[in-house]
């Protein structure tokens, strides 16, 4: 922070003015009781605008926040003059906040006339600054950017490796996608990879690319896509798991650029280690690959610029651009008045009294506080996001808000009715979302089908859903801004209180840039130390510590793990040890070189000690070396023990997986899970649960609708004399599909299948049955390559399976599936309404891509 910034921000009169603006802005957004609605003293806009003007050249967060606070406060004030509002617009111009200017003009068209009437040197200065804050695209088009976006573009254009960090609302996603689009539209062929932490973000990002690019550019999200090699220009939007699989399927795959979104996830356990591993493999294949990282609120983005690399052109940057003001508000019950809650704004390290609200009902349990407070403050307005600790709590919160809004009329909207129909068709007719949506209330958590979550997000952004209850999936990078965010005792996982860096990442969703001037974060029961062991205060940045670095920081522990036999992870053995061992063993077996590992800096003596330990155990492996690298995260020693067990059985052909359509599939997959649980690991305990999981896995691969799987489990429970609660049952089935069928089962069963196949080869046995691509069938929940092709071009699993009876060829390519969608007469098919709508919508997208191609 510069001396000028320090001097201006330390002015008592200026600080007091900022506090007045902040308190007034919250009061304007909240339905306070009558005693607290009297107008506050109007700030001295002339003085505040002058101070803010002096701060516009400053790049630090405090100065940026103050400039934005003054400008937006002035624009929202009913008592500021035309000249003052014009000056406020000029402030926004000087800091490159064009969306806020557009919003102000939309709300008050007279502002433009005020600027023209008050033309001065300030106007010329703002125009000069606006010209500075632009980027010229390869097409010659010019886009307006903010200071962070301008800096990113300059660094990415001049360096091979770049790592940036900025607040959630700084426009990272937009500028990075524009930069990638520019790379794809350049003069030379380009192959780009966008690594996203979740499948939800994969879908969101890939849709953006498809909407911006013509069909001469390949946009791929699946490693099984047979048309991957058919484009000179292509972008792959993948999770680290899918990129790893693509590496194994295409040994010569070498992208020119890899972008890692939400790069702080490199610190998250085994998935963080896998992210490090796929980056290491990409660099091993092509040392000249360009890497770009982006993370929110990271203090040390430079840690991702691997010091062991030979690249000299590197740059790290911590951006502090503020685009939307955020108000942190504490909400606590007024003593002896259970219906009344006091609000206090945290600003400048102090709590400022805002006023009181009254709830329609007194919460009879703690779990009703947040939804009732949200309903009291949000009313019929849009953009209300409510945080819940888990799927069950999310549905309960949504039910409470739904009940609190019982006097409000139902929302009459075709889009809402389509969501109702879709949720019943894709999940189950008893899924509660269908009921709540008609009153403008939705919920969203990780285990819900991807396409349904996307539709919920879309309706929330459009204001058709006024309230959305979400879990920590919001921390995974999904772009879902809001006007108000409500939360109490937020957790990360089932037990751990949410760390402050994660809280601020979540809080960054408050404030819809270009839609609202500010966002509000309402923290409930902050006086309860059990709910809030650490009260939120000033926004904090976190330090990134890659999981691989953390695990290998204790070399002795790793060597002891190897010498003890490198068994599967359990209560005594962290899974990070097993994952790191797999990575190191794969590197060692394939070339023996552990030098230059990406993301890990080891001393020569440490590298030698690990190599010696690996040298003691790897000669005992009869396992094919390629299987070690292929099955990331699984101990090679565990694979060897499985191989020994299959060889001891003597009949590997009898243990081979069968196609999911086989009549004996349930029993065969149960046997496979028995072997997996004993030798490889996974969440397949207790043994009594494995037949149920085998049935789930087989049904999922067969493409059985989720509703049928749910009804089958309900029927089984009734036959066992157990009661059935549909909300709970639906959540359990969706969790099993996501956690077991789509994540753990493909990881472990594909490894099992490969080991069994090797055993058969050793014994000279013929494998009579080909089960197909287990990983594809499990992750996508479909049995045929044709189904995969339909999904790869944009259809959901539900629609893909709905049309399966009309598409008999099991081996259609994506191009053939595209042609089918474009030519089919949906009115001639007996399809569910949601499936027919999706096909028509996809056809329109294809048409738009061809139109862009000219």
Model-derived segments and spans:
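C-terminal accessory/interaction regions of large nucleic acid-associated machines
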Residues: 14-105, 127, 565-602, 616-854
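Pre-P-loop entry segment of helicase/translocase ATPase cores
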Residues: 88-149
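Conserved C-terminal RecA-like helicase domain
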Residues: 124-136, 142-143, 148-150, 154, ...
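SF2 helicase catalytic motif II
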Residues: 240-243, 249-290
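SF2 helicase motor core recognition
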Residues: 242-249, 453-458, 468-483, 509-518
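Conserved interdomain linker/interface between the two RecA-like ATPase lobes of SF2 helicase motors
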Residues: 280, 289-400, 442
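Conserved segment of the helicase C-terminal RecA-like domain
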Residues: 287-292, 480, 484, 490-542
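C-terminal helicase module of SF1/SF2 nucleic-acid helicases/translocases
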Residues: 512, 517-612
